[in-house]
Amino acid sequence: MRFFALFIYRPVATILIAAAITLCGILGFRLLPVAPLPQVDFPVIMVSASLPGASPETMASSVATPLERSLGRIAGVNEMTSSSSLGSTRIILEFNFDRDINGAARDVQAAINAAQSLLPGGMPSRPTYRKANPSDAPIMILTLTSESWSQGKLYDFASTQLAQTIAQIDGVGDVDVGGSSLPAVRVGLNPQALFNQGVSLDEVREAIDSANVRRPQGAIEDSVHRWQIQTNDELKTAAEYQPLIIHYNNGAAVRLGDVASVTDSVQDVRNAGMTNAKPAILLMIRKLPEANIIQTVDGIRAKLPELRAMIPAAIDLQIAQDRSPTIRASLQEVEETLVISVALVILVVFLFLRSGRATLIPAVAVPVSLIGTFAAMYLCGFSLNNLSLMALTIATGFVVDDAIVVLENIARHLEAGMKPLQAALQGTREVGFTVISMSLSLVAVFLPLLLMGGLPGRLLREFAVTLSVAIGISLVVSLTLTPMMCGWMLKSSKPRTQPRKRGVGRLLVALQQGYGTSLKWVLNHTRLVGVVFLGTVALNIWLYIAIPKTFFPEQDTGVLMGGIQADQSISFQAMRGKLQDFMKIIRDDPAVNNVTGFTGGSRVNSGMMFITLKPRGERKETAQQIIDRLRVKLAKEPGARLFLMAVQDIRVGGRQANASYQYTLLSDSLAALREWEPKIRKALSALPQLADVNSDQQDNGAEMNLIYDRDTMSRLGIDVQAANSLLNNAFGQRQISTIYQPMNQYKVVMEVDPRYSQDISALEKMFVINRDGKAIPLSYFAQWRPANAPLSVNHQGLSAASTIAFNLPTGTSLSQATEAINRTMTQLGVPPTVRGSFSGTAQVFQQTMNSQLILIVAAIATVYIVLGILYESYVHPLTILSTLPSAGVGALLALELFNAPFSLIALIGIMLLIGIVKKNAIMMVDFALEAQRSGGLTPEQAIFQACLLRFRPIMMTTLAALFGALPLVLSGGDGSELRQPLGITIVGGLVMSQLLTLYTTPVVYLFFDRLRRRFSRKNSKPVVEI
């Protein structure tokens, strides 16, 4: 401790070092980015491919499977899932945490290139990829509305200009434009007119394609001039296509307008987007996995004036949803909680020391330690988030402990009449080892967290490092700045036989005297205390098994996301009506601020909604209570279901599900999967522990199955290719030509006019031109009958997959739900060919459950090793660790009392308690050992004296930690659901520990001392003289 004496005698140097630490911390604070939580996003890449008109089964077998085989060879792929629907396939690749997203993207592109030769012809474009997770909620949604512009024209402007500009902003991973599609020339064929003119659909398609070409024509030049050749080889509008000659009938020209309606429309008319009951185009912006959400949103907002300047006056651009306000509000709440904790801790010190000068010392030490931590956070690449700021809030109680122990011991010597500088030296020397032991053993608690892998390890690393750095800085400050300030600011007082008995002092003396009396009784009834101690151990085990558990507290981010699932045979027009009905119900709720939604595309019977709630200060209900209220109203809507879930800052996996948690069924037999999935889903829907049970297996869509008579076809001179081409031309929204414009490329889309395809009778009007040029009706060589068909085909890996999604009813924990699912699967007797496992957040929860006890045991073992090294003893660390069972009981009972499940945040609280409560024992054991060595006291006398002498600092440090955590319990507002479990755990553990360990620790100390002496006598051998 001589090294630290230099700081006492060199106050200027000490003050300047503390000022340097503070200035570095302030600079680091200003540079730190802001985020809701530490960066825990898995690198995710989405691969998309399309083949218009292809059935889901065709897309799965001919497009998804070749791509999956190639993509599955990429190193670092954690999970690969795919979903194939009408005309489209989407493959989600989730990589390991340590995989660089840009390197993964290069590998994905190489795998797509390798699979290209295996993909079917007729695909309008090569498969593409995006570095974004489609299951993540957008960080911002912009809407475009107009009274005069068509939806197609709005969509074109949004995708061609706005989306391109936004995508260039740092942090933006994907800009998904919804609500319509690109403009196109649509050719709606009249089957009867074609038949009358003897024109086949293929002939129409070929005529349009041939009439709209873009080829280089070259140039002509002479000795002086050069002329570039330009022709009118392109048709760009519906008016230009209408007079196009497609056929000659008996020498008379048949024009396209004679047999079809040609209109300027959109590529896919089966798309609709809305915002607050108005048709709208939605720009859904998602961030890159490694991007900071606040910085990305700020970048978008900074770009908005430029975007609005380039928008025509007829278009209205609005922000429909922004994730950043609730994040900022949550962080502001944590910062306020931190300030309150510092104030309360300093108040505790003042009440105990009853001196303004003495209180000023920890009032300086605490901010220096906390502010200095910001510099280390910046150097480590951390952010200001809920967890790191909660770590600093909790650190308030820790960093003041070191200063209190040093200050209180110096003050004791000053009260005995010692001179200030001498008291500072002597007091620091006496407790220096104690402070080092307390700090190192506390940091040791977090070593297992730093070594923990996966998402929980990544999530908790910033918390552990931030708290460890704060404790380290506090250790240095308490042994340098604190004794220096004590030596130069405090004054010695005359020795008093009786302490002053005023106010808190009188109460403290009374408590100390009462404690001494009760401790004497306890030391005479050690067996009873031993039974109590063993009872706390047993109660810990029982409570841990019984308490409900979850992965992460359910957050209220002020944003809800909803998935609509309608009858599988619903039409687009009916589905658009359902979207409007659902939006009206939600918009009428008093807690809702804004509603946007869209439907259409390859999945006509589904839709998505994004709901922004009013700020927490303007509504009384939580997000979950609002969902529960809306669920009752939404259930009355026939023919469709809307599943709502609160958007969370942590969402694991790339599956887009209609609920927060998923259970995935896998099978190598698609038939077995389709047989068992409805049975399992029905059984799970009946469980009271689950809500909103739904599945992505949609195999009950309406299909018209055409059966060709191949013999008749051969006799009539028709081949299968011609028949299939007929159907694709008629009903597949076939893209038959491309219109090239300076800003974009647009399609010519051909199909039978919707007026002539209202029902199945449209097939009777279809005909094929055979080899002899005769029109042969489709009914001559084909029969059709209705059947069921899948609307989507899903894979995981290379196996058929079906994901059952579910939410949790209010009051139900994730552990109760997973146990009920596992029990149900066992009771159903599902065959081995169908395998079930949790996925996404539920899967991470299962993995975390398996490692929680290991983590706690590892933390205790690490603390034991550190204490054993410091004390050079196998026994004394056990005495110190005997404080833990009572703290565990208090923490678990408090969680039960507040109806809070045991989550990852509560686990942090348990880990913190391991570090906090042992401080009391360390102070007792240190003084007892010193009294035995230097004072010649018996173990009983030594531990009794140590308990009385250290009663005041024990009460001060415990109350400081208690008041440091109390604002977390009492906090409300944004983000309180994250803070409260941590505060509840710590406060409950501290209260119970303080009540019991003041008595159990001396009893355990004496027990191990007797045990040690007994073994020493047994192992001692008489000395034999030779």
UniProtKB/Swiss-Prot annotation:
GO cellular component: plasma membrane
Membrane topology field: Multi-pass membrane protein
Main localisation: membrane
Transmembrane segments: 15-35, 333-353, 360-380, 387-407, 431-451, 463-483, 528-548, 853-873, 897-917, 953-973, 984-1004
Keywords for the protein's UniProt record, in alphabetical order: Cell inner membrane, Cell membrane, Membrane, Transmembrane, Transmembrane helix, Transport
Location of the protein in the cell: Cell inner membrane
InterPro entries (alphabetical): AcrB_DN_DC_subdom, Acrflvin-R, Multidrug-R_MdtC
Pfam families: ACR_tran (PF00873)
Gene Ontology MF annotations: xenobiotic transmembrane transporter activity
Origin: domain of life: Bacteria
Similarity remark: Belongs to the resistance-nodulation-cell division (RND) (TC 2.A.6) family. MdtC subfamily.
Assembly and interaction partners: Part of a tripartite efflux system composed of MdtA, MdtB and MdtC. MdtC forms a heteromultimer with MdtB.
Protein name listed in UniProt: Multidrug resistance protein MdtC
Organismal lineage: Bacteria, Pseudomonadati, Pseudomonadota, Gammaproteobacteria, Enterobacterales
